Amino acid sequence: MASEMEPEVQAIDRSLLECSAEEIAGRWLQATDLNREVYQHLAHCVPKIYCRGPNPFPQKEDTLAQHILLGPMEWYICAEDPALGFPKLEQANKPSHLCGRVFKVGEPTYSCRDCAVDPTCVLCMECFLGSIHRDHRYRMTTSGGGGFCDCGDTEAWKEGPYCQKHKLSSSEVVEEEDPLVHLSEDVIARTYNIFAIMFRYAVDILTWEKESELPEDLEVAEKSDTYYCMLFNDEVHTYEQVIYTLQKAVNCTQKEAIGFATTVDRDGRRSVRYGDFQYCDQAKTVIVRNTSRQTKPLKVQVMHSSVAAHQNFGLKALSWLGSVIGYSDGLRRILCQVGLQEGPDGENSSLVDRLMLNDSKLWKGARSVYHQLFMSSLLMDLKYKKLFALRFAKNYRQLQRDFMEDDHERAVSVTALSVQFFTAPTLARMLLTEENLMTVIIKAFMDHLKHRDAQGRFQFERYTALQAFKFRRVQSLILDLKYVLISKPTEWSDELRQKFLQGFDAFLELLKCMQGMDPITRQVGQHIEMEPEWEAAFTLQMKLTHVISMVQDWCALDEKVLIEAYKKCLAVLTQCHGGFTDGEQPITLSICGHSVETIRYCVSQEKVSIHLPISRLLAGLHVLLSKSEVAYKFPELLPLSELSPPMLIEHPLRCLVLCAQVHAGMWRRNGFSLVNQIYYYHNVKCRREMFDKDIVMLQTGVSMMDPNHFLMIMLSRFELYQLFSTPDYGKRFSSEVTHKDVVQQNNTLIEEMLYLIIMLVGERFNPGVGQVAATDEIKREIIHQLSIKPMAHSELVKSLPEDENKETGMESVIESVAHFKKPGLTGRGMYELKPECAKEFNLYFYHFSRAEQSKAEEAQRKLKRENKEDTALPPPALPPFCPLFASLVNILQCDVMLYIMGTILQWAVEHHGSAWSESMLQRVLHLIGMALQEEKHHLENAVEGHVQTFTFTQKISKPGDAPHNSPSILAMLETLQNAPSLEAHKDMIRWLLKMFNAIKKIRECSSSSPVAEAEGTIMEESSRDKDKAERKRKAEIARLRREKIMAQMSEMQRHFIDENKELFQQTLELDTSASATLDSSPPVSDAALTALGPAQTQVPEPRQFVTCILCQEEQEVTVGSRAMVLAAFVQRSTVLSKDRTKTIADPEKYDPLFMHPDLSCGTHTGSCGHVMHAHCWQRYFDSVQAKEQRRQQRLRLHTSYDVENGEFLCPLCECLSNTVIPLLLPPRSILSRRLNFSDQPDLAQWTRAVTQQIKVVQMLRRKHNAADTSSSEDTEAMNIIPIPEGFRPDFYPRNPYSDSIKEMLTTFGTAAYKVGLKVHPNEGDPRVPILCWGTCAYTIQSIERILSDEEKPVFGPLPCRLDDCLRSLTRFAAAHWTVALLPVVQGHFCKLFASLVPSDSYEDLPCILDIDMFHLLVGLVLAFPALQCQDFSGSSLATGDLHIFHLVTMAHIVQILLTSCTEENGMDQENPTGEEELAILSLHKTLHQYTGSALKEAPSGWHLWRSVRAAIMPFLKCSALFFHYLNGVPAPPDLQVSGTSHFEHLCNYLSLPTNLIHLFQENSDIMNSLIESWCQNSEVKRYLNGERGAISYPRGANKLIDLPEDYSSLINQASNFSCPKSGGDKSRAPTLCLVCGSLLCSQSYCCQAELEGEDVGACTAHTYSCGSGAGIFLRVRECQVLFLAGKTKGCFYSPPYLDDYGETDQGLRRGNPLHLCQERFRKIQKLWQQHSITEEIGHAQEANQTLVGIDWQHL
């Protein structure tokens, strides 16, 4: 379709390109009706530029639009070339002091916790780095897009409003200056004309609702029949639904559908079909039909191409206006005037109003363009920002109504702009007074919560997804209210007072609808059938919590406002209570001669609600009366006399009784909804305005009434009145065993009631209740949290309530109460309580949950025991109450309280079974302690001549009256002190008696109080000494008893050993043999340990016994026994790679014989080291497979291992494995038990002999191949080559291994082949042996690299599993040839050998520069026995090993010299003196000669020798490890310690001369010709001529990329990253590969790629190209490390970035500055280098099953 249209498009382009912007502008300047001229031009040109075919060409369209449409407008404004005109305007303009940078999605933003007026005040990175705030306590987050930098806004910052860039110069003063003075009259007029026309054009066309025709002045005569089927975005349908629908409707591929869906999601709309009307309408019908089943259908329009064209240009015009006003503030001012100018239709007819009111009808892309324009124009001009704010506030209710009906998120709604006005203090105040904004917002909120019950309270429907969606929208209004209140007024005008109080009235109306909502009644008999709705009410409460606090803060700032608010709140509360007492029968309660009237009400029978916001608001205001002293200054203005304390306490008391009854198990049948409500009532998010305020309200009530009356009402509400008012109730109950659970219930209720009294008296750390500061309250919270256990900063912050600015106030006080302990490698930094703060611990702290209370008690008692103190936890000394609450303390000494205490102590003394509990007693003791503390405080602060009214000690000393004559409380305490059953409370009772004596002494002789104190102490001391002596005696008895038992046990043990001597003898023998294998240090002299060659140190192989982890049977490892195997994991690896871009095009044809030195991809084998019988493992694996098949039929989930790929978990440690390695004895000692003659050939002789043998082998193979097609000539040619003496090519050695071992050799070989080449298993493939040798070599190289990086010695102590793995792997690789075809292995040897010793048989061998010498060495050494087994000439295998090693070493030295860098070094010596230096120079000269002088001149010999030594070290270390594990020769002690250079020791161990060049000199006869053949290779010449590259040595270590120290640099880098597939769109999930540094767009459809026929995410695809299937990524927006392996495995890992408190911040929720922790990054790097990523993922997925369910392949 496109190709047919191309010529037409081109033709149009040409006709348009002839237009001249200058000419058009000239015509316009002459025109009388500019409006008509411009519209005609647009009508003619726009449809010819935009929407010309099925696919948009944005670049082409924009170029044409600029040239033909926007260019003339720019010429018109400037009346000259805009390239000259605009710079002039820019020059005349005064730069703005506002930054105004609009944030991109994911860009870092910074807020200063010290200076920002509220958390919405943010800086961009550039301004932040140039501001004073970088040294303050700042918070860092990533922007969701939209919003702008507040730098330069003096209202946003308490100090430092400007950064370096936007700073005012000393001469400037901030003043409102008219920006138009910088423009000439003409420019103003022209700009005004063109802005008015273009802004109106854009608004008209974007709000145009007809799909097939244009506005009159834009219509053209001829109209084509070209339409678009335009699909619009909504937030209801998922990506999958849209993709599926499009595939059906417009018959496109999935990939195209994904492209459409991505664009629709990003821009808000996309044409999905282009053609005539009918063709497009057909698609629309299908889309609507397919998406209307469950929800409302997707919005689709069939739109004429010219309408679409004009709308596209409308958006372009708005963007253009935004960019043009950037040249001058004057232009910005003109645009603002145009936008806000009332149109002919009066109210709401300005262009800005029209856009705002049509917001919900516009698509996403259009909205974001005009929002962006508003931000860069109206919000950047302070004068017009105010006018815009007024328009916004006027339309507020309508905008919110539209938003409720809108199906887009708030981020793309115009209502989200509220934050820009409402948080600016002067604007917020102006809107509050002029537009009554507070009332408007609350009324708008109430508009949307229509459902009410009969009492007018909110009633929420069941919380469905739709309900939650709508309710979320409504909550945004609360956020707006919060914004308005966030900055408190510093001065009040009458108008502000009046409007705030009007708002307060509206707020009370809102709270009134919440007072008593969601009432509940106790279920009796059967469980509740349907959980009642509770979430919505609590969500509302949570959202309003800060608003309620802020309203109180506002009230506190002005005395008149506070008094009025208090009156209003009280009036509303009285209204709410009006209906409750009607028709209730009053009842009279009396105890101890006191009586009170109250209503008959049972919490357990009537309705009760946990929502009492009006009562709680009044409690808050009452505290403010005390705190601000208004209550004492203007008592006549307050309605304090009207207060009815019983009314005030009624509802809060019911609420607290409800909690007590729930705890006592009385509401079990009411289900989880009630449990959840109680939880949130106490939770840190809600408690400040719920539970805490209920306590305050009760404290208010108690302080205003007779405490006896209060306690009686309380007993009545707790339903305990009967129990305490009836004598002998306890005795009666204990005798009636049937009522066990009722007794238990009553006990709990008594405990809860006592706890409540403790709280009422003890909780006075609220400024206004007690004489304390706000910081004392926070300190106390922290002390009690840390008395449970040491805590991390984030835990501590979570346990403290936040204010509206997300601040807890913790940082200001934490230093005074806690020490900070820095974190280790994994943990977090911890705060520990300072010892001196422990005395402030209160066991009954009101914010403890039950679990926290018991933990804290245990921790504090343990601490006291450790400090050798008694374990009592007495109540701490408390600050005095404020005068308004002072009478509260009398509750402790009133008659009813003393009666309750006495009764409970009486029960404890008489010990009536279950009618009392220790917990109850503990609380009573605590209350007595509190009363004693209070009296002591009163006495110590007594004023002369002032009568002491608090006389608790006197009252507890008096016995009860007749007829009961009960003992005094004091007497009962003394009795209880000796009760054996109350051991746990003895210390506390002792403390109380001591306290009592001290007070008595103070009262007796107030003049000599110190003496009295001292006497009390002496008494106490003597009793304590007695106690100590008693404890000591008991401890001594226990010690003697322990010793006696131990002696008996050892005697029995000895006796048993004597009886079973033979058994023990055997065990000891086995032990020694086992330890010998473990120790690997047989009795060999250290003098000269040699690992290989004829002089190899002979070590007797100890017997090896191992135990199968599955059947626990022990077995010796022998050649003929059943195979024992290690669980192993084989994986492809690029950890050592120097070129990750290489890929194998066709694995089936690839020849892996020669490994390139860039090690582009190797095969690594790891093992956990656990041993099994091969048959046990097979059985285990079969059962895993069967289980997996059954599981797959049941559930379609992944497991952490992939059975189809042979994976399983080690049965013991659950380590991921995919094969097993057989355990073998050293293969060399088994396979070469042949007589060897003493005189072994030298290198030249050996090379000649091997070359001859190779020729014979090749000849025989050719003969074999040619047998079928033999000709006489061939046969003759073959007979010419004589067979060397002693060589028997027809001999095939017998395989010494048992069938079981042979099977395992094949199993592991096939696994290495399958994984290494990514092919299907085929045990007969000739490449299997190559991959076995390759994985052995690569694994050794990996280990050597790790050891070198960590600067550890090559034979230092290796972890057991690693040691076992390397030993088994090397022995396996050496034995594998026995199960391969002999000719195949011989063929590999011949080819490998030919790469060093040239042969005519092979043409295409790699040059010496393209071979990794260690892989070559391993291949040659391990393939050599296949040739040597047919050699009976007496030449030994050891000799062969040595010659191969020497040959490869020399080749490696030549390789090093050819590729070494030859810069001069400053420390070069003038004349070479050393033997090595002369030798190396001579060798270099030889190379120079053979390369035809292409090799650069040598620097000094010293430099050359030094670089060769350094370069060959990795090869020598790898060789040492290889031969050590191959031949079992222990390592010399020198190689087991670090520090020295091991070069000489390695040479000795490996039978090398320390001067390596001797090798060349000793074998010069053969080496010269070999060197010549190596150097003559054309590739070597190309390299030396600079035509190609080569790897130089030593190869540098691969490390993960360098990360920036400050995390925000990373966020900034990622925010600039555009999704590569979405045309410059910012990526939503930028993810950084830590291996290569690539930034990827993860977790989104746009960047999915196809991998092996499956669609996978960008990260998964990248792991295959970069890490051979394993990857490490950092998800930048989440600050989270992601490990991926294969397509189905992954896990999240702790990131290496920590905040100042040593904690990570995954998800960037806390926003503390993050810095790179090198240790943690090194740990991740080590996991990568050790190939442990897959293992780490396996363990993580086993530990956390939710990880298994994640679709990792889509990341």
Curated annotation (Swiss-Prot):
Q: Which Pfam families match?
A: ClpS, PRT6_C, UBR1-like_wing, zf-UBR
Q: N-acetylalanine modification sites?
A: 2
At which positions is Zn(2+) 1 bound?
99, 124, 127, 149
Might you give the EC number(s) for this enzyme? 2.3.2.27
Q: Where are the zinc fingers (RING-type)?
A: 1108-1214
InterPro entries named in the record: ClpS_core (IPR003769), E3_ELL-like (IPR042065), E3_ligase_UBR-like_C (IPR044046), Ribosomal_bL12_C/ClpS-like (IPR014719), UBR-box_UBR2 (IPR047508), UBR1-like (IPR039164), UBR1-like_winged-helix (IPR055194), WH_DNA-bd_sf (IPR036390)
Q: Where does Zn(2+) 4 bind?
A: 1108, 1111, 1173, 1176
Cross-link Glycyl lysine isopeptide (Lys-Gly) (interchain with G-Cter in ubiquitin), sequence positions: 94, 158, 165, 248, 255, 470, 488, 568, 779, 789, 1496, 1599, 1689
PTM Phosphotyrosine: at which residues? 1697
According to UniProt, the reaction catalysed is: S-ubiquitinyl-[E2 ubiquitin-conjugating enzyme]-L-cysteine + [acceptor protein]-L-lysine = [E2 ubiquitin-conjugating enzyme]-L-cysteine + N(6)-ubiquitinyl-[acceptor protein]-L-lysine
- What GO molecular-function term can you cite, just one? histone H2A ubiquitin ligase activity
Q: Where does Zn(2+) 2 bind?
A: 112, 115, 133, 136
Instruction: Enumerate the UniProt keywords alphabetically.
Output: Acetylation, Chromosome, Coiled coil, Isopeptide bond, Metal-binding, Nucleus, Phosphoprotein, Transferase, Ubl conjugation, Ubl conjugation pathway, Zinc, Zinc-finger
**Zinc fingers (UBR-type) by residue:** 97-168
The protein's matches in SMART domains, at most eight in alphabetical order, are given as: ZnF_UBR1
What does the PTM comment state? Dephosphorylated by DUSP22 at Ser-1694 and Tyr-1697, leading to subsequent ubiquitination and proteasomal degradation. 'Lys-48'-linked ubiquitinated at Lys-94, Lys-779 and Lys-1599 following DUSP22-mediated dephosphorylation of Ser-1694 and Tyr-1697 which promotes UBR2 interaction with the SCF(FBW1A) E3 ubiquitin-protein ligase complex.
* Tissue-specificity statement: Highly expressed in skeletal muscle. Also expressed in heart, kidney and testis. Expressed in acinar cells of the pancreas. In testes, expressed primarily in spermatocytes. Expressed in cerebellum.
Q: In which pathway does it act?
A: Protein modification; protein ubiquitination
PROSITE patterns to which the protein is assigned, alphabetical: ZF_UBR
Question: Where is it mainly found?
Answer: nucleus
- Which Gene Ontology terms describe the biological processes this protein takes part in? cellular response to L-leucine; heterochromatin formation; male meiosis I; male meiotic nuclear division; negative regulation of TOR signaling; positive regulation of T cell receptor signaling pathway; protein K63-linked ubiquitination; reciprocal meiotic recombination
Q: Where in the cell is it found?
A: Nucleus; Chromosome
Keyword set includes Phosphoprotein: yes
Q: How does it assemble?
A: Interacts with UBE2B; promotes the UBE2B-H2A interaction and the ubiquitination of histone H2A by UBE2B and UBR2. Interacts with RECQL4. Interacts with Tex19.1 and Tex19.2; does not lead to Tex19.1 degradation and stabilizes it. Interacts with L1RE1. Interacts with CASP8. Interacts with ATXN3. Interacts with UBE2O.
Q: What is known of its domains?
A: The RING-H2 zinc finger is an atypical RING finger with a His ligand in place of the fourth Cys of the classical motif. The UBR-type zinc finger forms a pocket that mediates recognition of type 1 N-degrons. It exhibits preference for arginine in the first position, and a lower preference for lysine and histidine. It binds N-degrons with a methylated arginine or lysine in the first position.
Name of the featured protein: E3 ubiquitin-protein ligase UBR2
The opening ranks of the lineage are: Eukaryota, Metazoa, Chordata, Craniata, Vertebrata
